[in-house]
Amino acid sequence: MHATTVAVDLAKSVFQLAVADASWRVVETHRLTRTQFERWFANRDVGLVVMESCGSAHHWPRWLNAPGIEARLLPAQHVRAYVRRNKTDAADAAALLEAARASDIRPVRVKSVEQQALQGLHRIRSLWMGTRTSRINALRGFCREFGITIPVGARTGLEAIGRVLADPATAIPQLIRGTAQLLMEEIRLLQARIAQLERELTDMARMSPACKTLLSVPGVGLLTATAMVAATSGDVSHFKDARHFASWFGLTPREYSLGSTRYLGRISKRGDRYLRMLLTHGARSVLRAAKVAQGAGREVFGVRRWALDVQTRSNHNKAACALANKMARICYATLRDKEPFAEGTVPLNKKISRQAFVMPV
């Protein structure tokens, strides 16, 4: 037991502290500014600092670890259950102390500066992609108001909108035509920035052994590999097993059990929704390519064959979620063993397929 435990309710400029003794009783409370907060830890011998995993939370554990202070991040949704009565900064700090005593709450792993920078690139790309989509949809709406329909698809739609705006004979009024062309220039600029960012991700992936390993997994491309490295740094040792890793993305089924009755429902959708989205899109791509290959008479084996069998028994969406779950488990195995995924050329039956992905105890 640490002699002194400090719970910190983080904020932008005001920090609420609750200091506990060896018996977890609150003996001091402080409300400090950012400067006072840094000075307070410089003059104290602190054993453990607990904080919620929120904005700026990963910066402070790194700052505290430098002088040798242990810092622990707790999931905010689990800490919330320990808040009594009204929600205040002091109540949040006291709830952090109670949550820190619970042995069943897994702390959040602190990200490095490099991990957060890589994750930031993905967030910026998503922001630009959303902005590009909103601009394209706005131009579609303007054209539709004047009786011009634009085909679906970003690339096809942009080409059609460009032709419509360039043709003076179309029904687009001159009053809005110039502004719409400026909107088209914004879209082209966004596309150039997205392409440049993806080139930076490609250069990073070439230098990362973990990314090279992940790229060997079917359905895992540049975005999924780099996002997974940003989330885990390529180290999966803190996960108990492959199922625990898949549950971190919300790809494992919810369980409703009572007595001897056990029911597994839909996927939980907890955890990292961005990586869950990437894995699911990758699984859909693998399923579609496998179905095309099967229709062309080519041999389909391994996880692709397994996914097609699942689709035959259920439906496409369930098969895509099942394959995304399988892909997450394969990613865990490749990162754990630091070896690329080598899919065999022999078709797998149901029994062998199950044995192939059993993780050692």
Residue ranges: model-predicted function:
Residues 1-3, 195-220, 228-233:
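Extended, structured, electrostatic nucleic-acid-contact surfaces
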Residues 2-20, 96:
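Gly/Thr-rich phosphate-binding beta-strand-loop-beta motif of the actin/hexokinase/Hsp70
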Residues 24-48:
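Nucleic-acid-processing active sites and adjacent nucleic-acid-binding tracks
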Residues 41-82:
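Conserved DEDDh/DEDDy metal-dependent 3′-5′ exonuclease domain
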Residues 71-120, 160-165, 261-270, 274:
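Short alpha-helix plus adjacent loop in nuclease-associated cores
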Residues 82, 213-222, 226-312, 353, ...:
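Phosphate-backbone recognition surface of nucleic-acid-processing proteins
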Residues 123-213:
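Glycine-rich, often acidic, oxyanion-interacting loops/wings at catalytic, nucleic-acid
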Residues 260, 304-361:
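Low-complexity, acidic/Ser/Thr- and charged residue-rich accessory regions of DNA metabolism proteins
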